């Protein structure tokens, strides 16, 4: 009997991730009507996405070789929930570019920063592919910046990937 319990525990996995939403202080900005219209969420999206716990998403694949993968739908939801079409999404820890890819798909601009060269190459490929396949109004450009450790390299290398090819 203890063997069965032991085997079951080998497969136990904690798939809970906490998401913190932080906002710059001050007044809310005025958003143009067209930008708001392009960013509308459906009633079902509002109902599902603004819950405290999301139980409708599946885990991400580790096939990309990154140690901390997450489902692309997580980034897409958060971007659509907390930004408007045409806004810029900053991802300081870009990894393989999931957030920038989601930004392009949802019509946002993206600036991504990653220190690992192997991940930068994967991110550039994914962003370029997303830019070719998604013609959403609002997306202007995406950048993947490889600048090593930003504490010692204050000037980033310009490595832009055009989103509207």
What are these regions (language model features)?
Residues 124-162:
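S-adenosyl-L-methionine
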Residues 1-122, 165:
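Core catalytic lobe of class I
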